[in-house]
């Protein structure tokens, strides 16, 4: 079957939840037996989000094939079974880089390079490549209609609609209906103007998804349909809800999926959303609440740890527990001491880069180890646990990472200079390599040690997990750490790199070099997060000795 396209644009304001809407629609269509993928087009000039500040952009989501992508791809993978790849996310910077590289090679035969047709053609080619092999490709365009940066993308999707035919394309526009409490009514004018702007660019939306705090009266729906040139049934209300996992059922109840399949002429069964009903039921029926202390560097923006936040919630769902995350700035631990960690049921130190707040993270790992509090370290969270153990248990008082102290005389963590990539080829890096695109990144094989906590949690001896790091445990000093009691329970494919460590004389102290949060989903959870939340419940209820 020829791929069908659903283009999702946004208007009025940013951060309306286009990614959630796209993911929810994809979940319904997948539940109807269709093969669905989702693309995210980002109008910013950066080649990818890999070197962008998490405070500005949120987390960098890593795919199996090692792409550093927008956090919306995390939403997509949590909603559908399709795994995202490098083809599912590209930016203006990536498009221009490729066009300029083609120009330098002479691919354009001396033509004058212009936004139309060269940039718009490149965008279309990437959209088609990303959707190839799937029944439906939902394409989310970042930003807001009217932004200068978005114009080449809007022109590209307009042209693509003409090329593939109107029966193979749907334009879905997400807008805001502000509710004025003083007047007691929703205002439709911003939506009308947003659609007017979109139509001025040659795109007539087929579906309007309207965000609102309240229900939309029928007369307002009629008005929106009339002034925006869509049918009344194509005006979909996306009301604020207390759980994003209720949205698939909310959209299905309004017939959004039926509009799409009829437009595309597809014959497919009704959607079975029983798995999502189960997720919503698990959220509503919890018997415990645990507090997880997340000690990090970017705590002022929770989206910097979006996948970790969601994975913790998923772990809670599978343990009938609601999870409350207490964000703790690691610098505050340095200034105020570990007393601010009191009262938490478990401690998590997530990934990060840079020296700021590093000693606070080390103190958090020490506090968890000494006080027998469940600890999960991720990436840098494993490295600080190694440093803390080396200093305070193994007797390496000057232990540190060369990331933070280049001339450290006891470097228990150092730069990886050589490793096997996802294809089995050897990759090499030096201290002089660029920051962008030079990490050990993507899914890697890990061997688990039988009898370990992680082996029991995963239930298998080999796993694949996603990485994003430059530094690793120094194997030259590893024997000293192991003699002091540290246990390596996970090794890389060639068994040269430490992937997981545990402290055996502790109720639950586990740290991984990889990022387990990237593969956690609300329907399945993740072994490490399920185990971590269970340990938090056990600690809270005094089940640990």
UniProtKB/Swiss-Prot annotation:
Pathway: Pyrimidine metabolism; CTP biosynthesis via de novo pathway; CTP from UDP: step 2/2. The active site is at residues 379, 515, 517. Mg(2+) binds at residues 72, 140. L-glutamine binds at residues 352, 380-383, 403, 470. Signal peptide: none annotated. GO terms for cellular component: cytosol. CTP binds at residues 14, 147-149, 187-192, 223. Residues 291-542 form the Glutamine amidotransferase type-1 domain. GO terms for biological process: 'de novo' CTP biosynthetic process; pyrimidine nucleobase biosynthetic process. Residues 1-266 are annotated as: Amidoligase domain. ATP binds at residues 15-20, 72, 239-241. PROSITE patterns: GATASE_TYPE_1. UTP binds at residues 14, 187-192, 223. It comes from the Bacteria. It catalyses: UTP + L-glutamine + ATP + H2O = CTP + L-glutamate + ADP + phosphate + 2 H(+); L-glutamine + H2O = L-glutamate + NH4(+); UTP + NH4(+) + ATP = CTP + ADP + phosphate + 2 H(+). The keyword Chaperone does not apply. Its EC number is 6.3.4.2. SUPFAM superfamilies: Class I glutamine amidotransferase-like, P-loop containing nucleoside triphosphate hydrolases. CTPSs have evolved a hybrid strategy for distinguishing between UTP and CTP. The overlapping regions of the product feedback inhibitory and substrate sites recognize a common feature in both compounds, the triphosphate moiety. To differentiate isosteric substrate and product pyrimidine rings, an additional pocket far from the expected kinase/ligase catalytic site, specifically recognizes the cytosine and ribose portions of the product inhibitor. Homotetramer. Catalyzes the ATP-dependent amination of UTP to CTP with either L-glutamine or ammonia as the source of nitrogen. Regulates intracellular CTP levels through interactions with the four ribonucleotide triphosphates. This is CTP synthase. It comes from Psychromonas ingrahamii (strain DSM 17664 / CCUG 51855 / 37).
């Amino acid at each position: 079957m020829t791929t069908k396209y659903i283009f999702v644009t946004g208007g009025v304001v940013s951060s309306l939840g286009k990614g959630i809407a796209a993911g929810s629609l994809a979940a319904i269509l997948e539940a109807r037996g269709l093969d669905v993928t989702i693309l995210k087009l980002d109008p910013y000039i950066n080649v990818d989000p890999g070197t962008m500040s998490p405070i500005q952009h949120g987390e960098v989501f890593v795919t199996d094939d090692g792409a550093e992508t927008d956090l919306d791809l995390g939403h997509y993978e949590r909603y559908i079974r399709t795994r995202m790849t490098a083809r599912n996310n590209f930016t203006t910077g990536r498009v221009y880089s490729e066009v300029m590289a083609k120009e330098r090679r002479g691919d354009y035969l001396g033509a004058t390079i212009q936004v139309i047709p060269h940039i718009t053609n490149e965008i279309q080619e990437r959209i088609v490549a990303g959707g190839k092999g799937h029944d439906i490709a939902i394409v989310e365009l970042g930003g807001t209609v009217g932004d200068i940066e978005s114009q080449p993308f809007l022109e590209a999707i307009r042209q693509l609609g003409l090329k593939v035919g109107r029966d193979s394309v749907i334009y879905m526009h997400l807008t805001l209906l502000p509710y004025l409490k003083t007047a007691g009514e929703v205002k439709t004018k911003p939506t009308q103007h947003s659609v007017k702007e979109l139509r001025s660019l040659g795109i007539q939306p087929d579906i309007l998804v309207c965000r609102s705090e309240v229900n939309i009266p029928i007369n307002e729906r009629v008005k929106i349909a009339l002034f925006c040139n869509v049918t009344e049934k194509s005006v979909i209300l996306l009301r604020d809800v207390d759980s994003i996992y209720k949205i698939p059922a909310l959209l299905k109840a309004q017939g959004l999926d039926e509009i799409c399949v009829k437009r595309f002429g597809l014959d497919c069964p009704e959607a079975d959303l029983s798995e999502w009903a189960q997720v919503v039921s698990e959220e509503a029926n919890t018997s415990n609440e645990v507090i997880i202390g997340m000690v990090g560097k970017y705590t002022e923006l929770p989206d910097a740890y979006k996948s970790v936040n969601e994975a913790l919630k998923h772990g809670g769902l599978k343990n009938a527990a609601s999870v409350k995350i207490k964000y703790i700035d690691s610098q505050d631990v340095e200034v105020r001491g570990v007393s601010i960690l009191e009262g938490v049921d478990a401690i998590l130190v997530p990934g990060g880069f840079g020296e700021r707040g590093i000693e606070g993270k080390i103190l958090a790992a020490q506090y968890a180890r000494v006080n027998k509090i469940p600890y999960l370290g991720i990436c840098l969270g494993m490295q600080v646990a190694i440093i803390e153990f080396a200093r305070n248990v193994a007797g390496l008082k000057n232990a540190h990472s060369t990331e933070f102290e280049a001339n450290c005389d006891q470097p228990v963590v150092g730069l990886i200079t050589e490793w096997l990539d996802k294809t089995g080829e050897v990759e090499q890096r030096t201290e002089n390599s660029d920051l962008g695109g030079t990490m050990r990144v993507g899914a890697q094989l890990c061997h688990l040690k039988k009898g370990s906590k992680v082996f029991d949690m995963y239930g298998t001896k080999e796993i694949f997990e996603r990485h994003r790091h430059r530094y690793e445990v120094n194997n030259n000093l590893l024997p000293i750490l192991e003699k002091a009691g540290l246990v390596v329970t996970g090794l890389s494919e060639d068994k040269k790199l430490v992937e997981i460590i545990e402290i055996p004389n502790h109720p639950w102290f586990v740290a991984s070099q990889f990022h387990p949060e990237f593969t956690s989903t609300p329907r399945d959870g993740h072994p490490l997060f399920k185990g971590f939340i269970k340990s938090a419940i056990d600690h809270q209820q005094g089940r640990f000795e």
